Amino acid sequence: MIKLSLIQTSQNRINQVSRFVNSLNEQININFEEIQYIFVDQGDHLSAFTKLNEKIKFEYIKSDKCSLSHARNIALKLVKGTYVAFPDDDCWYQADTISKVYSILDCGIYDGVTCIGYNEKMMPTSTFPPASSKIKRFNLCAAISYTLFLRYEKTLSFDENMGVGSPHNIGSGEESDYLLTLLEYYNHNVFYDASIIVHHPAEIDAPKDVVALQKAYKYARGDGYLMIKHNMPLHHILKFLIRPFIGILWFTITIRPFEAKRSYYRLKGRIEGLTFKLK
């Protein structure tokens, strides 16, 4: 019986995928025969799996290049596990990541677990709360795809209008949408455990260029679209808009032109996402 299905896709990161495979092989206190690993290959990564633990049920799917959400939906059709996770191609696990996740899920109280992300230098990859707690609709505890371990629901898939590669430039929010749908419509209980770690590179020294601005803009469109899709209250939306507006003013006053411009693109993207309608 499969307990956990891991869904991963990549276009051109064979070294990072190999690192993930190594971290998966190094998991302790688990039965590898209960792990399913589904990889949607949009490039040429087959050699990364030559040393994968043979007890793991490996599913390899060759695909043309596509959006992240579409690739995950391809894999979701093959899931056999009770739970599903979505490790990024450049993330990697601590040796006890999966066993600690199991310790929460096996209690039978929670349908899912989300954890904390750290980079190579053991610095948080986002603003994660210091204390563990139950996930709530208005407090997802900085949950992001690679930190999620969730009960599999056969009728739920990713919104392909959202995420990296979106045809509508809605470049983020697909995992938050998936998680919120589980909370709102499937009545799932999900626990955030600050002691469970998944590693992921952090863009601390990302270049301050047009690419960074476009990324901020696309992500902001995703944030705005997510707010409307899940009927977030007006005060929540206003707070969401005021922050980048203040950022524009503050960074302009302090003569930080790139940061001011990035705040502008975030505000612009969030407004566009809030008003976006599918044709």
Predicted regions and their residues:
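A conserved acidic beta->alpha catalytic loop
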Residues: 12, 23, 38-49, 65, ...
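Short aromatic/hydrophobic "clamp" motif used to bind/position activated sugar donors
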Residues: 84
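Non-catalytic, C-terminal membrane-associated alpha-helical segments of glycosyltransferases
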Residues: 213-222, 228, 232-279
